[in-house]
């Protein structure tokens, strides 16, 4: 980002700062930015990437957004200039007032390598995806499902969770492993008591919840004893009520923990 002179336009309907016309990219000064969280669902992604925000969807919460879902024209090229527009709308829907310029400018901030030494070291010394494509440009659970089942069974938003218990019935990588005589476990880091993958794939894996989804302490024992299964998947702690062990940062993220 540094040195690229990036910015996003300020929509004319913004109550504060519209006379500035654009919000330039700047270095973040707050580790809790933006707050509240930016829009995650796929119709927010439409606005963020194409700067299309249907008038009836402006300032609407996720459950109130309607067709055509801020969809861009067919074959449109992403302009990447709708992050400010979407954040002003999302902030207003959640807080009940439009944000000040200083509040919505947070959406155009990022961190330097010096501010994030651990992540920077990992990026410098190991493989990094610099062209990553989300199977569903939406929230976490659908992309977790694609990771382990290559589909989300047509589900495109997280809520309601009840959909996971009945509709996401696609075959999983875990079942394929069993078909080839391979063993597997999902190790869930404490204090989380439930596995996200167990919930996401409940229709297919409900009979394995008691045997193949275990606490992370068991991973430590298996590793020490040399008895790890053929396939191990570790779910880091991502509870908003405790310190996290992943960049997922509690409940406020749209990407899977890895």
Indicate residue ranges for each PLM-predicted region.
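N-terminal pro-sequences and low-complexity stem/linker regions of secreted or lumenal proteins
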Residues: 1-258
């Amino acid at each position: 980002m540094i040195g690229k002179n990036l910015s996003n336009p300020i929509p004319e309907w913004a109550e504060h700062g519209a006379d500035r016309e654009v919000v330039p990219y700047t270095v973040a000064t707050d580790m809790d930015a933006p707050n509240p969280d930016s829009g995650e669902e796929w119709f927010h992604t439409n606005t963020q990437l194409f700067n299309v925000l249907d008038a009836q969807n402006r300032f609407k919460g996720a459950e109130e957004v309607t067709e055509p879902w801020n969809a861009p024209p067919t074959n449109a090229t992403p302009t990447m200039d709708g992050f400010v527009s979407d954040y002003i709308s999302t902030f207003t829907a959640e807080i009940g007032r439009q944000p000040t310029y200083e509040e919505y400018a947070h959406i155009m901030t990022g961190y330097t390598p010096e501010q994030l030494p651990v992540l920077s070291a990992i990026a410098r010394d190991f493989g990094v995806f610099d062209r990553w494509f989300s199977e569903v440009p939406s929230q976490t659970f659908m992309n977790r499902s694609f990771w382990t089942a290559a589909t989300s069974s047509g589900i495109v938003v997280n809520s309601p969770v009840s959909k996971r218990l009945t509709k996401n019935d696609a075959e999983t990588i875990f079942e394929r492993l069993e078909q080839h005589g391979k063993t597997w476990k999902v190790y869930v880091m404490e204090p989380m008591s439930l596995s996200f993958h167990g919930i996401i794939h409940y229709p297919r894996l409900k009979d394995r919840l008691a045997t193949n989804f275990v606490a992370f302490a068991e991973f430590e024992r298996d590793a020490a004893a040399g008895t790890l299964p053929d396939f191990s998947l570790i779910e880091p702690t991502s509870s908003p009520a405790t310190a996290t062990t992943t960049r997922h940062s509690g409940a406020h993220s749209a990407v899977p923990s890895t």
